[in-house]
């Protein structure tokens, strides 16, 4: 793994933490539940792969999109 790859993954990990916190705050969830929703979301691989520059979207926007995907699947 290159230094650039390591930096990108560090940035993504920080983004995931902010998404988890935003989802917990917006929907009254525990951090554990928010983390579970994020890591099982079909959007996570798209964010990781940079599809449509999703990783550039705001944390709250992504938290809401992930929440909507979760509730629609329920």
What are these model-derived regions, one by one?
Residues 1-74:
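C-terminal alpha-helical interaction appendages
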């Amino acid at each position: 793994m290159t230094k650039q790859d390591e930096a990108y993954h560090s940035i993504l990990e920080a983004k995931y933490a902010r998404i988890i916190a935003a989802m917990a705050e917006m929907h009254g969830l525990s951090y554990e539940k928010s983390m579970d929703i994020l890591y099982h979301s079909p959007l996570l691989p798209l964010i990781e792969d940079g599809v449509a520059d999703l990783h550039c979207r705001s944390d709250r926007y992504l938290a809401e999109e992930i929440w909507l995907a979760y509730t629609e699947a329920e």
